[in-house]
Amino acid sequence: MFENEFMKITVAGVGCGGNNSVCRVADAKPTGITYFGIDTDSKALRSQAVTPVHLGGNHSSGRGCGGNAALGKAAAEENYEMLLSLFQDCVVAFIAAGLGGGTGSGAAPIVAKAAHEAGALTIAVVTKPFAFEGARRMTTADEGLEELRKYSDAIIIIPNENVRSSTTQKITFANAFRLIDDVLCESVLSVLEILTKAMLINIDIADINAVLRNSGDIFIGNAVAEGTDRVNKLVASVTNNPLLEKGMNDAKGLVVYLSANHNVSLDEINEISNKISETTAPDANIIWGFDFDDSLGDMIKVSVIASGVK
């Protein structure tokens, strides 16, 4: 459970894929977060947990964009003042979208522009299409991503195709989308936890801004490990997220949040921190936080956010 009483944090889904992911985040029930589902298709805006925002007007009659990103962009631009009002006084804004379709690729960059203009730290979390969806949809996704980069401080990219290459086992189509949604949801929740949780060694919004503002592509990893070799297991797991497009090698900025019970040794904390830091650039800006959590038992938990990744 995440509780936030100190800053306005907004999570906005744009298009069908983005809205589905935002609903997953809302289902985790972090408090003090504002959720919007933004779409040109009025039928898609039916979640009780998320406030619906319909991009209507001359460019959309409530029936979507038919894969036309230009229509999605025009619909968002026509409603720009309304979008700007959604992010008034917002400190951190997450923009979730599935790229390749008309609304996600066309409208998401304009939504990010509104969040950025309102002064929010703007973090985009996006997916790219499967290869079987065709070259045209991939081109639309790539063009949307380039527009999104103009207005986002940080971007997490999840290529759907990585689901196939990340496992040797057969996976159902439904489970593939669940995995993709899980990565997107966990990425958002990780940042929310770091921002909103009171820690023994604290990480605040100024720290997050220092690492993520105007940072470009970022990597997010989460892991827990227990047992005799838990340090090596933890580091190997948290520094490798095969579903993301970018790894964390040579990162220019790094946020590390560790939690463990009161029996964790200083040597273990030191070893974990050093091993994770070894993956970054020599002059990386590293910000570190820690909190005790006896509910973890023998487990150590770590979350990392790496910026300026290649």
What are these regions (language model features)?
Residues 1-310:
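Tubulin/FtsZ superfamily GTPase core signature
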